[in-house]
A protein has these predicted regions:
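Cytochrome P450 core scaffold surrounding the K-helix E-X-X-R motif
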Residues: 39-43
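Glycine-rich cofactor phosphate-binding loops and adjacent beta1-alpha1 units
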Residues: 155, 198, 203-272
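Short glycine-centered segments of the SAM/dcSAM-binding site in methyltransferase folds
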Residues: 79, 162, 253-254
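Glycine-rich beta-strand-centered segment in the early N-terminal region that forms part
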Residues: 20-34, 47-92, 131-133
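Short Gly/Pro-enriched turn/cap motifs at secondary-structure boundaries
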Residues: 7, 18-19, 51-57, 108-112, ...
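Mid-domain Rossmann-like dinucleotide-binding core that forms the NAD(H)/NADP(H) cofactor-binding site
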Residues: 134-214, 218, 233
Length: 272
């Protein structure tokens, strides 16, 4: 099969590789769509992988073409999306249902071969069926959509507040839409790209602000009557936006870092 293989830092090659074999409890998926996550960029450009060679890709959709022994909930022909986290299911955190806190986890497309290939094999529980009327392109967005809603749920989210979304990427757009769905006084998306901000408006943002423009902070605070934002979601994983999150926050606000930073982050005592 063909695959996009990361063979070294800054070196991705389109190669012919051996097809993965189905094992008990696993399913083989013919990949239709596989997204490039922001976290994949440092994996390719900044020595961010665990080993070479590796096939990235953890946001994907496709068709089940083969099932292993013992598989009962997924069948050949099912249209599925992939859930990439592979918790150990044995540690204290897993036993409490806190799978994202597992310290012994694996991850499809990072610690295991991923979906930037013709086929990928995953555990049955990580293949999530979706309806025939859902396009494969949308099915591949399952993972970032759940990342966003997890961040919202972890912050005791409630409506009636001003909400700031820092970063207009995929996860930022989903976070904006979830907070709109669950109710908000006004949701404002912040980014440095006018193109992304225009998309945010089309997808439902009440206001958008380009943080490269002079006076953006005054404009942002004016929207809230000077009180700040009750919920601030940082989704870009960048040091400047993580600092900005606290500047925008109202008293007793919820500040959530969904984005993953790849540089050292420090705060002054005054900022904290």
């Amino acid at each position: 099969m063909k695959a996009a293989v990361v063979v070294a830092n800054e070196d991705v090659q389109y190669q012919e590789v051996e097809e993965p074999q189905v094992t008990p409890g696993h399913v083989k998926i013919k990949v239709r769509y596989s997204g490039i996550c922001g976290s994949d960029i440092p994996r390719v450009l900044n020595h961010g992988v665990h080993f070479y060679p590796i096939v990235l890709g953890h946001e994907f959709s496709g068709d089940v073409v083969e099932v292993g022994e013992g598989v009962t909930k997924v069948k050949v022909g099912d249209r599925v999306s992939g859930a990439p986290l592979l918790p150990c299911m044995k540690c204290d955190d897993c036993q409490k249902g806190n799978y994202s806190l597992c310290k012994h986890y694996s991850f499809i497309g990072s610690r295991e071969q991923g979906a930037n290939a013709d086929y990928v094999v995953v555990p049955e529980k990580n293949a999530v069926p979706f309806a025939d009327n859902v396009p494969y392109e949308q099915g591949a967005m399952f993972e970032p959509a759940t990342v966003a809603i997890h961040g919202v749920f972890q912050n005791d989210y409630h409506g009636g507040e001003y909400v700031a979304i820092l970063g207009g990427g995929t996860v930022g757009m989903f976070t904006m839409q979830w907070t709109k769905i669950f109710g908000s006084k006004k949701v404002v998306v912040f980014d440095i790209s006018d193109e992304r901000l225009a998309l945010a408006k089309r997808l439902g943002a009440d206001e958008v602000i380009n943080t490269k423009e002079e006076g953006y902070m005054e404009k942002a605070m004016a929207i809230t009557g000077g009180k700040g934002y009750g919920f601030v979601f940082e989704t870009a994983g960048q040091v400047p936006t993580m600092h900005m999150a606290f500047e925008l926050a109202a008293n007793k606000a919820h500040v959530c870092f969904i984005g993953t930073p790849h540089e050292n982050l420090t705060f002054t005592p005054k900022q904290w």
